[in-house]
Amino acid sequence: MRVRNRKGAGEMLAENAHIVVENPADFKGRWSERFGNDHPIHIEVGCGKGAFITGMAALHPEINYIAIDMQLSVLSYALDKAIEADLPNVQMMLVDGAALSEYFADGEIDQVYLNFSDPWPKGRHEKRRLTYKSFLATYEKILRPEGEIHFKTDNRGLFEYSLVSLANYGMELKKVWLDLHQDEEFAPQNVMTEYEQKFSQKGQVIYRLEAKFLPKK
């Protein structure tokens, strides 16, 4: 998500150090201490303006959530929502998603969300896609055994690429939606991102998948 630079965003994050973790590497292997409990931890890589992560946290107080984004202004808008909702189970990190293993110990995370990631459509940018094999290796490292990735996008090309990438990596595709918003059974539990709300209003198809890592043979 690209947004204009927000005046005072840096100061805002610094003033809310109880939510935005200034030095996340300090908590590697100790995130339960940061949250003050041993609840499962889910992370969203590329959290945008925070509608999804705060919505999930409100619905599931029994789960801890970490919102991750590398854009200062974007994360400040997500912080707005977290402050307004007063959610004790949300933390935030201003870091690059490619470096997750620097901040989380092996097996420390239970689930990864990838929502409306940049599709990087040009072939020379394939390695930047968040479902490229090097990213999958990082997720596998920080996730518990058989940990899961939940992925949503409006981009058919990225979705098809991701299906192949995950399958080639040896992941099990548990569920696949080719038109998520037509699934009335799933609708009550679907928390939408800002992009998803906008695309849904325009009638665009939303794709979704759930996949898990399998034990190495």
Swiss-Prot record:
Please provide, alphabetically and separated by semicolons, the GO molecular function terms listed in this UniProt record. tRNA (guanine(46)-N7)-methyltransferase activity
List the catalytic residues: D118
* Record's keyword annotation contains tRNA processing: yes
Is Cytoplasm one of the keywords UniProt gives this record?
A: no
Catalytic activity field: guanosine(46) in tRNA + S-adenosyl-L-methionine = N(7)-methylguanosine(46) in tRNA + S-adenosyl-L-homocysteine
Q: What class of enzyme is it?
A: transferase
Pathway listed: tRNA modification; N(7)-methylguanine-tRNA biosynthesis
**Residues that hold substrate according to the record:** K122, D154, T193, E194, Y195, E196
Gene Ontology cellular component annotations, sorted alphabetically: tRNA methyltransferase complex
* Keywords in alphabetical order: Methyltransferase, S-adenosyl-L-methionine, Transferase, tRNA processing
Annotated positions binding S-adenosyl-L-methionine: E44, D69, D96, D118
Q: Which CDD domains match?
A: AdoMet_MTases
**Chain segments carrying region Interaction with RNA:** 124-129
List the HAMAP family hit by this protein, alphabetically: tRNA_methyltr_TrmB (MF_01057)
The entry sums up its family as follows: Belongs to the class I-like SAM-binding methyltransferase superfamily. TrmB family.
**This chain belongs to which protein, by name?**
tRNA (guanine-N(7)-)-methyltransferase
Give the organism, scientific name.
Lactococcus lactis subsp. lactis (strain IL1403)
Gene name of this polypeptide: trmB
